[in-house]
Amino acid sequence: MQLVPLELNRSTLSGISGSISISCWIIVFVPQIYENFYRKSSDGLSLLFVVLWLAGDVFNLMGAVMQHLLSTMIILAAYYTVADIILLGQCLWYDNEEKPAVDPIHLSPANPINENVLHDVFNEQQPLLNSQGQPNRIDEEMAAPSSDGNAGDDNLREVNSRNLIKDIFIVSGVVFVGFISWYVTYCVNYTQPPPVEDPSLPVPELQINWMAQIFGYLSALLYLGSRIPQILLNFKRKSCEGISFLFFLFACLGNTTFIFSVIVISLDWKYLIMNASWLVGSIGTLFMDFVIFSQFFIYKRNKKFILN
């Protein structure tokens, strides 16, 4: 493959951002599926959130097929649906598993070791144990004994720094893969002769399939509605425990790059109408995901205050 220089234009910018968006959406479900598997629990996720997202992806798939979108988009829509089913399966499986019985002796108020943690054990807002009865990895590290009274803050900052570096590395890798996959295609197409167009043939017009648009708007409404139960669950628990930060980070990045890839091509009204349902869904869910992002940081500070 011959490397070729980039020509920055609307098509190039749209292609790069679109490819990055696809990379984000391919990986988006993996962090949450792993989080559920690691904790052997999905109690941090709202079941209604997963069900509505699955319904939205089903309508998105139907709309993509009816609107005759690119085969890549149809394959991705089908992939999203399968990933949703896996996520839903985890929720149903772990919810039906037997929870470990609580030992009333070890949690007795008469036991001085548990005097300060009895309330927290029964409080969903500050879980000390995961579903297997094992201490959470971060809580374990922050609880490390030290003669320094500020050791808890130092450990917390150290854990947060490691997690931040890890997240930056993962996100950068996904963005890089998205760019490289686009650039390889760009180089291959660059070396091929352009297709010969017959000037006598009329330029094909954009055809709007209104049934596909209806499915697209239904999908957008379901995507928007899916975030509400999750936001309310986080607010009720005063915690984002059990939710993968990368899950929503990749969703935000995927939506942002998708929106840019669409509007950078053209602002023609007919073109925007054809893509309006997908744009509405992406913009709306992006706003809702920012709300969940704010909950991550708000409840993270609350947890630090409680630990101190």
Swiss-Prot record:
Pfam families: PQ-loop (PF04193)
Gene3D superfamilies from the UniProt entry: 1.20.1280.290
Localization, UniProt: Vacuole membrane
Topological domains annotated Cytoplasmic: 34-44, 90-167, 227-244, 299-308
The keyword Hydrolase is annotated on this UniProt entry: no
Phenotype upon loss of function: Severely impairs lysine import into the vacuole, and partially decreases arginine import. Resistant to canavanine.
Molecular functions per Gene Ontology: basic amino acid transmembrane transporter activity; L-lysine transmembrane transporter activity
Topological category with respect to the lipid bilayer: Multi-pass membrane protein
Cellular component GO terms held in the UniProt record: cytoplasm; endoplasmic reticulum; fungal-type vacuole membrane; membrane
GO biological process, one term: L-lysine transmembrane import into vacuole
Protein name stated in the entry: Vacuolar lysine transporter YPQ1
Organismal lineage: Eukaryota, Fungi, Dikarya, Ascomycota, Saccharomycotina
